[in-house]
């Protein structure tokens, strides 16, 4: 919509069919097109928040609501974190993460814009109904210059443990573990995943395999996507070797997620070049120890280039249907500036997606 307002739309999946409802305004002020994130509380049915950034203030803001079936409730009051902290860059796709073991508790990454630009931290917040509250001040993991490209995930197998993946000045990809006690975060020592030019750094834990995680990022040194698997045991990080992500390319974005219904299975969604256009692709993979193996990439659409923002693709796995996930994409001018989605299916015994299990394309709201 040309107004620049914030909209939310509910999609319903039936088999391989994705049907969209009517877009609803949640913020009638101009927003930055990125970053935007919707996050559901895994411990409270229907409870979710939206993270957004006002164009006028550049401050990270959170609003809560509930979803019953396909019906949205009334939005609560939007709450801005401290005005000295900006929202994350468009490169961050997991700005806010809910604690998988505590209802209504989340962590939110941010970067200081004044008085000391570059300080990076996490704030712990809560949701009760449609009321959002920040429980304290930001807990900084680094007081030296960082780029505001950070993501946060909770370790589902270790209580009160979070991991932040971020980009250090110099474009190094780094991770740091935090231990949460109440509203306080105690930080470990940052570790380096890649000591070269990195961007769009994204990490996820396998909820079905203790200590296991995987990552993906754009490797500026090769011009391709890079990914790998590792383990975190206590304070000890072990990183496997980086593997090339199929169809990664300049300007690409990445979201990597594990299937919550089967151990060691995951997917990556990214934007890359097929030699003609920039397209959205999805690739199935598997992890064994610190070894990550990818199948063949599959394009999300046949409509040509995908654009409309720095984060044109995102994915979410079904909590109940093994291997099923939805990817949302934005088509550029070749596709009529539309938003759309596709229902995808991983097969438990394969690492590739084919014409028989990449199904259900549906287009939706017009962007402009």
Where in the sequence are the language-model features?
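Primarily extracellular surface-attachment and macromolecule-engagement regions
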Residues: 20, 73-75, 84, 239, ...
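Short loop/turn motifs that cap or connect beta-strands within the blades
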Residues: 22-32, 77-88, 137-145, 190-197, ...
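Extracellular receptor-binding modules and their adjoining Ser/Thr/Gly/Asp/Asn-rich linkers
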Residues: 1, 7-12, 29, 34-42, ...
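Short, surface-exposed tryptophan/glycine-enriched loops
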Residues: 320
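Beta-strand initiation motifs
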Residues: 15-22, 68-77, 129-137, 182-189, ...
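Extracellular glycan-recognition modules
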Residues: 116
């Amino acid at each position: 919509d040309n107004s620049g307002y914030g909209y939310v739309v509910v999609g319903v999946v039936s088999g391989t069919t994705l049907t969209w409802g009517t877009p609803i305004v949640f913020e009638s002020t101009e927003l930055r097109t990125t970053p935007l994130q919707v996050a559901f509380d895994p411990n409270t049915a229907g409870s979710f928040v939206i993270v957004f950034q006002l164009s006028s203030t550049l401050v990270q803001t959170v609003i809560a609501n509930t979803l019953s079936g396909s019906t949205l409730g009334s939005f609560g009051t939007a709450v801005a974190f401290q005005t000295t902290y900006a929202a994350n860059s468009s490169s961050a796709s997991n700005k806010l993460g809910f604690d998988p073991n505590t209802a209504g508790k989340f962590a939110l990454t941010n970067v200081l814009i004044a008085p000391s630009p570059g300080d990076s931290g996490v704030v712990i917040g809560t949701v009760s109904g449609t009321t959002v509250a920040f429980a304290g001040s930001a807990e900084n993991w680094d007081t030296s210059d960082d780029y505001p490209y950070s993501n946060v995930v909770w370790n589902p197998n270790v209580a009160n443990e979070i991991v932040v993946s971020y980009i250090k000045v110099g474009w190094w990809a780094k991770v740091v573990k935090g231990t949460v006690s109440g509203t306080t975060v105690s930080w470990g020592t940052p570790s380096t995943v890649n000591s070269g030019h990195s961007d769009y750094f994204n990490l996820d834990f396998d909820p079905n395999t203790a200590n296991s995680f995987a990552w993906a990022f754009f490797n500026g040194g090769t011009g391709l996507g890079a990914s790998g698997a590792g383990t975190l045991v206590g304070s000890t990080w072990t990183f496997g070797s980086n593997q090339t992500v199929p169809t990664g390319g300049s300007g690409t974005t990445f979201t990597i997620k594990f299937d919550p219904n089967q151990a060691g299975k995951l997917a990556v969604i990214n934007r890359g070049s097929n030699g003609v256009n920039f397209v959205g692709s999805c690739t199935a993979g598997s992890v064994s120890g610190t070894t990550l193996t990818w199948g063949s990439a599959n394009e999300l659409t046949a409509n040509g280039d995908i654009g409309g923002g720095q984060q044109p693709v995102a994915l979410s796995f079904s909590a109940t249907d093994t291997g099923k996930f939805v990817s949302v994409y934005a088509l550029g001018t070749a596709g009529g500036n539309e938003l759309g989605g596709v229902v995808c299916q991983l097969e438990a015994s394969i690492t590739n997606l084919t014409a028989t299990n990449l199904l259900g394309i549906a287009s939706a709201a017009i962007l402009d």
